[in-house]
Regions:
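Conserved phosphate/anionic-ligand binding catalytic regions in large, soluble enzymes, centered on
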Residues: 19, 24, 193-202
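Glycine-rich, mobile lid/loop segments that gate access to catalytic sites or pores
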Residues: 2-24
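Short, well-ordered loop/turn elements at secondary-structure boundaries
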Residues: 29, 55-56, 199
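Detector for methionine-enriched segments
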Residues: 1, 22-25, 82, 106
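C-terminal nucleotide
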Residues: 12-15, 33-193, 205-211, 216
Length: 219
């Protein structure tokens, strides 16, 4: 926990990046981690063991060759827009309200904050439900359900969270290219999604050993 907090402080104060604790926490704890950030000073952390090879799968990381330079505003816009939606309901964050609140006030929220902010808020609620499903799938060894939820999560990130490419540089979409190639290579036998905060960097890919050669060749 302390390592993650130190890493976050370094990113926030030294590098000027408005990052949260999720990536740092996952790195410091290791493996698959379910985290509840209700209390950011003392998040609830659960390490969930999973052996991909026992399910006939391998996990790899694909470097999209896109760096994170000049993306601070893109990252900062996500929490800013989500908090704006929450603020309409006099809440500090979206976990204090519900999806129904947003749906019932859709018109005024779209008018005041724009469609992207509303879509990102809807992603937040649905993604939190998916996290519970993902954790349940791993705890009970329902690996196919886990893969399905990962793909759903990636699809939602692309359409609703919109963190695959920077709108300020839409001609460069390396993450989108990598996802398209990965999905084709997997042939519906695995999962892929954007990694971390998105916009650049890497994508994780889970592929079956039965298509290992073809997948690696295509990628």
């Amino acid at each position: 926990m302390k390592i993650a907090q130190i890493a976050q402080y370094a990113e926030n104060e030294y590098f000027g990046k408005p990052s949260g604790l999720m990536d740092q926490m996952a790195s410091s704890v290791g493996g698959f981690v379910a985290i509840d950030f209700k209390n950011t000073q003392a998040p609830i952390i659960e390490n969930i063991p999973v052996d991909f090879s026992s399910y006939g799968h391998a996990l790899c990381i694909i470097d999209t060759k896109a760096d994170h330079a000049d993306l601070t505003d893109e990252y900062a816009a996500i929490p800013r827009e989500m908090k704006a939606i929450a603020g309409y309901f006099s809440a500090e964050c979206l976990r204090e309200i519900s999806r129904a609140d947003v749906i019932l006030n859709m018109g005024i929220l779209r008018q005041k904050y724009g469609d992207r902010a509303v879509l990102r808020a809807l992603h937040f609620f649905e993604e939190n439900e998916r996290v519970d499903k993902l954790a349940h799938s791993l705890r009970h060894q329902h690996f196919d359900d886990f893969l399905s939820s990962i793909n759903e999560s990636g699809n939602s990130s692309y359409k609703y969270l919109q963190n695959i490419f920077a709108v300020s540089d839409y001609t460069h979409q390396a993450v989108g290219i990598a996802l398209n190639v990965a999905e084709h290579a997997l042939a519906r036998k695995g999962a892929c999604r954007v990694h971390g905060g998105g916009f650049a960097g890497t994508i994780p890919v889970s592929y079956t050993h039965l298509r290992a050669h073809e997948t690696r060749h295509d990628l």
